[in-house]
Design a protein with these regions (language model features):
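Short beta-strand/loop motif that positions the catalytic acidic residue
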Residues: 185, 191-193
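Catalytic histidine-centered segment of alpha/beta-hydrolase-like enzymes
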Residues: 219-235
């Protein structure tokens, strides 16, 4: 059986768009199960929206596909959700791959807190295009030109993004999580980020490297948070994921020595 891979996107591009290059380059090496974020199911986020809604939805998707255990891939906000899933349901994962998690679940370090409190302050009171422009600008390294917004009026789906991203930020802040849970992971982790993203991405990579027992961190050159998906899921990146998936499958099939 091929590796079964569940993919969770971030707060901007839907899963089909975000992971199209990954799926195309992987070819027949794996079966992919795309899961869009629950926060966008309705025109506006539910008042009680929480990280638990997203985590439980991954369970429902996996159960509906008959996946007892699987590989999980997350990007940005989907990276936070994937990390939360990995910490609370480690027995279901064979491997975890994340590109630039929006943040790491759990109590923030001083460096993290300074960045996120600054981000929230800059976004406060903004709506629509102003919200999105500020959100994008804050995710890249100083001096890096962020991509321009799409031409024309936003589609109905994209109009959901500013309130949806704001709801995700609130949910991430409210989510209670102990980072020590990561130490229980018995699966490999591949964490990637771009050298043109805000330096806090390197901070998060370093934090995760302190907790996960088996983690590989890769910094990609010439890449930031908002480059086109094909610049993130390059042949090099996809080959690394396929190698990890197959190695993890073999390890998972071996009898436990514990």
């Amino acid at each position: 059986m091929k590796p079964q891979v569940v993919c969770i996107p971030g707060g901007v591009a839907p899963a089909a768009q975000r992971y199209a290059p990954l799926i195309a380059k992987a070819g027949e090496a794996a079966d992919f199960h795309l899961k869009d974020l629950e926060v966008y199911n309705e025109a506006t986020p539910p008042a009680d929206f929480s990280v638990e809604h997203e985590v439980e939805a991954i369970d429902r998707l996996a159960d509906s596909r008959g996946l007892t255990r699987f590989h999980l891939v997350g990007y940005s906000g989907g990276g936070f959700i994937s990390l939360a899933y990995a910490g609370t349901r480690p027995e279901r994962l064979i491997s975890l791959a994340v590109f630039e998690a929006a943040r790491v679940p759990g109590k923030l370090t001083t460096e993290e807190r300074d960045f996120f409190s600054g981000l929230e302050a800059k976004l406060a009171g903004l709506k629509g295009p102003d919200f999105m422009a500020t959100f994008v600008r804050q995710q890249v390294k100083a001096g890096v030109q962020p991509p321009p917004p799409p031409a024309g009026p936003p589609s109905p789906e994209m109009q959901k993004r500013p309130p949806g991203i704001a709801a995700l930020i609130r949910a991430f802040s409210a989510y209670e999580f102990d980072r020590e849970l990561f130490r229980a992971a018995r699966f490999p982790v591949y964490y990637a980020y771009g050298d043109l993203s805000h330096p806090e991405q390197a901070v998060k990579a370093g934090i995760l490297a302190q907790y996960f027992p088996d983690i590989h961190v890769h910094r990609f050159d010439g890449v930031h948070h908002f480059v086109p998906p094909e610049m993130i899921y390059t042949a090099e990146h996809v080959d690394a994921l396929i190698t990890m998936w197959h190695k993890a499958e073999r390890s998972a099939a071996e009898p436990s020595l514990q």
